[in-house]
């Protein structure tokens, strides 16, 4: 896949969600922004996607409960948000 911007989330043990805006190339990736504000993450991602004329993807997640009753959030794919 060519250069693109991706938004992903990480749920900490204490319940805090951290959002990451990542610029990905064929062989490398770099974190452009990270923080706990969802709106700021999407604003940064849209701004960078438009500035660099690259597509923007959001990571889709699915909740699963294992045999011990622990809930896990698993990434299942990417959704294309904007093509420039």
How would you label these PLM feature ranges?
Residues 1-42, 51-53, 58-62, 66-84:
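Short N-terminal "domain-start" leader segments
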